């Protein structure tokens, strides 16, 4: 059995990302930016978003969080996403789930432009991923894969529990 040091893998990944962001800044003369939309006041979501913001800033990304009360109208959220889709200073958009019941999750996901879909949930990105084409990879599976990739083992030899 191999024990994976997740903290070490995360530190290595952060250093690599910091370098990549620095190179992107130099090459394109702009800072890549992540905008997270948080609706409501669920404590786990707030903690998760705060951690995303901290990690983004740590590697040199521009990070914005847009907060709405859980009573926000769906159209307000869709309008904001459309505005962010057109904003060249926003490289990625993430809408923190879960959403209040009156907001159609699928409609929200489909409104995010596929090239700015950080979660990889847009139907075009899901289709591309399942067909083997280049696409965004959903965060959770990627987050499971990356620490394993730092072991430099081939996946068929890895057993997880």
Identify the residue ranges that each predicted region occupies.
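Short beta-strand segments enriched in small/hydrophobic residues
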Residues: 31-41
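Anion-binding alpha/beta catalytic cores of soluble intermediary-metabolism enzymes, centered on
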Residues: 95-153
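Short, solvent-exposed amphipathic alpha-helices that sit
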Residues: 46-59
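Short, well-structured alpha-helical segments in soluble
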Residues: 76-87
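Single conserved hydrophobic/aromatic residue that forms the stacking wall/gate
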Residues: 152-161
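Positively charged, low-complexity intrinsically disordered leader regions
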Residues: 1-26
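Short beta-strand elements in bilobed, periplasmic/extracellular small-molecule ligand-binding domains
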Residues: 56-68
